[in-house]
């Protein structure tokens, strides 16, 4: 299940760029985005998110079978929506000019050089960070202080997407909303059964291939 989630995440974020390269990209910046300042040091939060993601997705994947399946199915459903939106509503952002004066500015320039300003709506940074909140909030074995800390970290990451000028406000809210809606959809729709069958079929296929290579 985890491999399926990771695989589709890569397809969503990187694969769609192969399709939308020549498309017109919309700028969803608002007046509020113009007010929000560039704060280069927040790149530490922006890039440090991966440690948070690994920890909380691991916690979300070791719950009881139904909760783990619901969490990962919601993640997959959300990424499918992202895939559709990245193609149908391609967006971009106008990044500020940053002087090459100190280490944080250099880090920002490096980030801009490796991450093109597209696939922004909704923000996958915010989406994934909020799924980290969903992953732990119902687990009785996880202390309340960590659940609160997860919310704080997730919100800090969302803010960092704005202060690094990687996203605009609508992207961040859309990411959080999509995470909640995807999880609610999985819980209410009955899609969990077909999802489990799909995962089981994929796992059986992979196992059969591995056995074939060994022989």
Model-derived features: positions:
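N-terminal transmembrane-helix/juxtamembrane module of multi-pass inner/ER membrane proteins
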Residues: 1-52, 99, 210-215
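Aromatic-anchored segments of alpha-helical transmembrane domains
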Residues: 10-11, 79-85, 152-163
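Membrane-interface loops
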Residues: 16-31, 61-145, 193-215
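Membrane-interface loop-to-helix entry segments
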Residues: 37-51, 113-135, 169, 173
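Hydrophobic, membrane-inserted alpha-helices
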Residues: 52-56, 128-135, 152-160
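Interfacial helix-loop-helix junctions of multi-pass membrane proteins
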Residues: 117-121, 156-183
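Hydrophobic transmembrane alpha-helices
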Residues: 133-137, 179-187
């Amino acid at each position: 299940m985890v491999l399926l989630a990771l695989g589709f995440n890569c397809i969503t974020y990187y694969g769609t760029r192969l399709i939308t390269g020549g498309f017109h990209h919309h700028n969803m910046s608002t007046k509020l985005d113009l007010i929000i300042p560039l704060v280069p040091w927040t790149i530490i939060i922006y890039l440090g998110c991966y440690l948070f993601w690994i920890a909380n997705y691991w916690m979300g994947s070791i719950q009881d079978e139904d909760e783990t399946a619901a969490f990962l199915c919601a993640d997959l459903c959300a990424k499918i929506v992202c895939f559709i939106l990245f193609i149908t509503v391609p967006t971009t952002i106008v990044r500020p000019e940053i002087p090459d004066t100190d280490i944080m500015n250099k880090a920002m320039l490096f980030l801009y050089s490796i991450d093109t300003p597209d696939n922004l709506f909704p923000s996958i940074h915010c989406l994934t960070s909020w799924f980290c909140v969903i992953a732990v909030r119902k687990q009785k074995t996880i202390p309340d202080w960590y659940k609160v800390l997860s919310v704080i970290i997730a919100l800090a990451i969302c803010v960092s997407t704005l202060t690094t000028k990687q996203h605009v406000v609508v992207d961040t809210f859309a990411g959080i909303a999509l995470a909640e809606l995807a999880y609610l959809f999985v819980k209410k729709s009955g899609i969990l059964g077909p999802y489990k069958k799909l995962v089981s079929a994929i796992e059986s296929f992979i196992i059969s291939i591995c056995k074939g290579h060994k022989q």
